Regions:
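Structural signal for interior beta-strand "rungs" in well-ordered beta-sheet cores
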Residues: 2-165
């Protein structure tokens, strides 16, 4: 486990052996950080958020309560392969949002660019590629393998079918 000396971890948080926590990061009460997770500098993980899987969050990201970041893909073809979720810098992942890792058949990586806002209850499916400065409004569902370019705004309660670019 690599926890920078300036990181603050609440006593009730559960940070698994092997996790990497960057400088000046904060892990809140009852948050869970998995063993393969890498958090950049100044990342804030609020109460009850879960970050797991082979997941990387860039510098200055914030994750709100009850978000689930880096869980395995919702794909019946997934059988435990080493796949990843990479989130860029300065992203905001609001409460109840879900972001899945990739699948072997889809390239193995779900990617979220820099300066992205993922609002409450939104979902980013396996192997999705989300550009920079994207906003996913409340309860948006981005299915597997979707590609969103830079500066996209998806309105609330919208669904984007898998493989859409």
């Amino acid at each position: 486990m690599s926890i920078h000396g300036t990181a603050v971890i609440h006593p009730s948080a559960f940070v698994e052996e092997g996790a990497t926590i960057g400088e000046e990061s904060y892990i809140g009460p009852f948050a869970v950080i998995g063993p393969e997770v890498v958090l950049g500098a100044r990342v804030t993980v609020k109460s009850h958020a879960v970050i797991t899987g082979w997941t990387e969050l860039g510098d200055d990201c914030m994750v709100w309560p009850f978000a689930t970041v880096g869980e395995v893909p919702q794909d019946l073809k997934y059988h435990g392969e080493h796949t990843r979720l990479i989130v860029g810098a300065r992203c905001r992942i609001r409460g109840g949002a879900t972001l899945n890792t990739g699948t072997e058949g889809g390239g193995g990586v779900t990617r979220v660019g820099d300066d992205v806002l993922i609002m409450t209850g939104a979902h980013v499916g396996h192997d999705a590629q989300i550009g920079n400065r994207v906003i996913l409004v409340n309860n948006v569902a981005i299915a597997g393998h979707c590609v969103l370019g830079d500066d996209v705004i998806v309105g609330g309660l919208s669904g984007v079918h898998q493989w859409v670019r």
